[in-house]
Swiss-Prot record:
Signal peptide: none annotated. GO terms for molecular function: 18S rRNA (adenine(1779)-N(6)/adenine(1780)-N(6))-dimethyltransferase activity; RNA binding; rRNA (adenine-N6,N6-)-dimethyltransferase activity. Specifically dimethylates two adjacent adenosines in the loop of a conserved hairpin near the 3'-end of 18S rRNA in the 40S particle. The lineage of its organism: Eukaryota, Fungi, Dikarya, Ascomycota, Saccharomycotina. This is Dimethyladenosine transferase. Residues 1-22 are annotated as: Disordered. Its EC number is 2.1.1.183. InterPro entries: KsgA/Erm (IPR001737), rRNA_Ade_Mease_Trfase_CS (IPR020596), rRNA_Ade_methylase_Trfase_N (IPR020598), rRNA_adenine_dimethylase (IPR011530), SAM-dependent_MTases_sf (IPR029063). PANTHER family: DIMETHYLADENOSINE TRANSFERASE, DIMETHYLADENOSINE TRANSFERASE-RELATED. Belongs to the class I-like SAM-binding methyltransferase superfamily. rRNA adenine N(6)-methyltransferase family. Keywords: Methyltransferase, RNA-binding, rRNA processing, S-adenosyl-L-methionine, Transferase. It is an enzyme of class 2 (transferase). The gene is DIM1.
Length: 317
């Protein structure tokens, strides 16, 4: 992903728009397939920035800046803004908006897909998130080597409620458990369809994600790997998730790798697959968690499982 120099967006790039419309209208056709719904309500935009607790020394990552309605407000508070945008037309609009102003020196525009790009360090993330990257963005932010202190993100309302869901809630899922392990999540505001241009088909909500410090002393991928198994059928017993051939094959392979690192071998006459199955069944039975349903299990119960599996040499990533 390359930095977008200002000169790239001068001249013809600023005059032309999708569908042959002229730049003088300051309007081009939004690509809703990319989740382009511009936040037009200045009060909502200011509320998002205010909730981000930006310090004068902060570098802020903005995902999907669009035409810059949030960006210009972030620039007033932050030391630097890195805006990641896939659409060159949007990048052109944003560049033009700050051109010749003091804020121009504080803004770096990166063209490309935020999910596929290695990101530089940043303190805060703000995003009017394209809905199709909601889950990948959350996981990418939490799995950064140095996760942002605060993320204030706009999502489809139902997705936002999944982040906040508790055991027993209908929306409680792997995402809920995962995010709440690494961060405190709070609801900032609900945002109606009429606050966007063009209006999306659903209501939106803004959430604030504040990472835990210190970070929980578990491996991100191990935790996520366990939850993937447990939530394959969240309303079935956890036992059921560990009986699929695909899951057993992965755990058997990982167990074999663990044995090699420990300098151990399977006793002659033993079947590795049977050994792994026996270990899994013993853990699920001894903890009493095997007969529980993931939809009703809390963080403590999943942590108990992960610790017991690791003691037995069974890993998930």
């Amino acid at each position: 992903m390359a930095k977008a120099p200002a000169k790239k967006f001068s001249g013809g790039a600023q005059r032309e728009s999708a569908g042959g419309e002229q730049r003088k209208t300051a309007v081009f056709k939004m690509n809703t397939d990319l989740g382009q719904h511009i936040l037009k309500n200045p009060l909502v935009a200011q509320g998002i920035v205010d909730k981000s607790d930006i310090k004068p020394s902060d570098t802020v990552l903005e995902v999907g800046p669009g035409t810059g309605n949030l960006t210009v407000r972030i620039l007033e508070k932050a030391r630097k803004v890195i805006a990641v945008e896939m659409d060159p037309r949007m990048a052109a609009e944003l560049t033009k908006r700050v051109q010749g102003k003091p804020e121009q020196k504080k803004l770096e525009i990166m063209l490309g897909d935020c999910i596929k790009t290695e990101l530089p360090y940043f303190d805060v993330c703000i995003s009017n998130t394209p809905y199709q990257i909601s889950s990948p963005l959350v996981f990418k932010l939490l799995n950064q080597p140095r996760p942002p202190r605060v993320s204030v993100l706009m999502f489809q309302h139902e997705f936002a409620m999944r982040l906040l869901a508790r055991p027993g809630d209908s929306l409680y899922c792997r995402l809920s458990v995962n995010v709440q392990m690494w961060a405190k999540v709070s609801h900032v505001m609900k945002v109606g369809r009429g606050n966007f241009r063009p209006p999306p088909n659903v209501e939106s909500s803004v959430v604030k994600i504040e990472v835990k410090n210190p970070r929980p002393p578990i491996d991100f991928n191990e935790w996520d790997g366990l939850l993937r198994v447990c939530f394959v059928r969240k309303n079935k017993t956890i036992n059921a998730g560990f009986k699929t051939s695909a899951v057993l094959a992965v755990l058997e392979k990982n167990y074999q790798t663990w044995l090699s690192t420990q300098g151990e071998i399977i006793p002659e006459g033993s079947n590795l697959s049977d050994v792994v199955k026996q270990k899994i069944n013993k853990i699920l039975t001894d903890t009493g968690i095997g007969e529980m349903r993931s939809a009703k299990c809390d963080q403590t119960e999943f942590l108990t499982l992960l610790n017991e599996f690791h003691k037995a040499g069974i890993y998930f990533a």
